[in-house]
Amino acid sequence: MGLMHKDFHSGNIINQNFALSYITDFGLCKPVTENEPENVYGVIPYMAPETLSRGEYTKASDIYSFGMVMLEVLTSYPPYYNIPHNENLAMGICEGLKPEIKCEIPQFLKEIMEKCWNFEPLNRPTAEELGSQLGKYDYRCNNEIRKQVNNQINVANKSNKNFIQYDPNVKHSEAIYTSRHLPFVKSKKFETHDTKQCNFVIPDDINDIIEENEIQEN
């Protein structure tokens, strides 16, 4: 469809049942050809580095957000729940900061999640690739893959036996999980300078000129 959601986070997802969820709040949804880098809205922990650094939205930015939603679904902890959601966090994300993974996650899901977090947009999977990768592990997968998946899930469950689920009461008072305008995000501006090309030509009588200057100096 060539659209970007531009505000994808767990607060914009509703569940009908265990197997069916819907993405909501398409108020900021735009075609991929439309960007408003001077008017950036979002929830900082779910926003991609390129969006926070220069107000740039792409389909890959939504994939980054999907990776953060995966973290919350798999661990119960929203990203960066224990620190202020301010310009310092935005700067950290732009410098490569990643959220803490609070518990053991089945390896096949962890690998997909961390690919979505890749700092470089072009290195993140597309939505089509995500569908294909996740589809390999559904209930219709072959016996060998199902065995690997079950083993990874069992290992994670065993490791998480005493895991403490997320308690909203431990959330930092300045951790904000609602979409808001972020005035500190500005489009990247490149300074340009007028340049002039100068042509330098060595005259044929350069030796005579040098000798004449030497005589005058003496």
Where on the chain are the PLM-derived regions?
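Conserved activation segment of eukaryotic-like protein kinases, specifically the C-terminal portion
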Residues: 37-51
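Conserved C-terminal C-lobe helix
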Residues: 104-117
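Catalytic-loop of the protein kinase fold
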Residues: 2-15
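Conserved catalytic-loop aspartate of Hanks-type protein kinases
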Residues: 62
